Regions:
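Acyl-donor (CoA/ACP) binding surface of acyl/acetyltransferases
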Residues: 1-18, 28-29, 66-181
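Sparse recognition of residues in long alpha-helices and their boundaries
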Residues: 35-36, 63, 158
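Conserved GNAT-fold acetyl-CoA-binding loop/helix
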Residues: 29-53
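A short helix-loop-beta-strand connector motif used in the catalytic cores of GNAT acetyltransferases and
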Residues: 53-67, 77
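Residues forming the ATP-binding cleft of Hanks-type serine/threonine protein kinase domains
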Residues: 23
Length: 181
């Protein structure tokens, strides 16, 4: 699939339903393989409330910042950062919503297009990512993107996760500027 059919943009109100559908209509086993503790999931309305809040906040105020991924102008996934320390660092997440679009290398291309938004708008010096160590796809993507593997350890990486082994990856602004995406 050519990169000409791929684009990215900041989240809009029209994205809240399909993004929520991804989380609330996905197979529970898929979510567990990603490291989600289903008992920690907020309600759909609470989830939508968090997304709506993000839309009304300045970059400096955001607790999460989401970029929507489009294939032929249709939303097919997203990436967001959270655990944001504005002007310093944030933690990256990446999600392709439909299983038909997974394992095609789209995530790699989309993240390359997304990273400038995070570095520029959040004024970041470093982006970290801590995928579930037993989920190979995002770990392979981080390596291919030029993120540096720092360590593997056990933690609860997010508010909807169970305790799990994660791989901690980092990409500094300096290294990002050197990469020729």
């Amino acid at each position: 699939m050519g990169s000409a059919s791929l684009s990215v943009r900041e989240i809009q109100h029209s994205d809240i339903e399909p993004l929520s559908d991804y989380w609330f209509n996905s197979d529970p086993d898929f979510l567990i393989r990603m490291g989600v503790d289903l008992s920690k999931m907020p309600t759909r309305e609470e989830w939508k409330g968090m997304l709506n809040e993000q839309l009304s906040q300045s970059y400096e105020e955001k607790k999460s910042y989401c970029i929507i991924w489009l294939l032929k102008d249709e939303p097919v996934g997203h990436s967001n950062v959270n655990r944001i320390i504005f002007g310093e660092e944030a933690y990256l997440h990446l999600h392709i919503w439909d299983s038909d679009n997974r394992t095609k290398g789209l995530g790699l291309q989309f993240v390359k297009m997304t990273l400038p938004f995070f570095f520029q708008n959040m004024k970041l010096k470093k982006i970290c990512c801590e995928p579930y160590a037993l989920n190979p796809a995002p770990n392979k993507t981080m390596e291919k993107l030029g993120f540096e593997f720092i360590k593997e350890y056990i933690t609860v990486p997010g508010f909807i996760n169970f305790e799990q082994p994660v791989k901690h990856w980092e990409l500094t602004l300096e290294k990002f500027r050197q990469l020729n995406y």
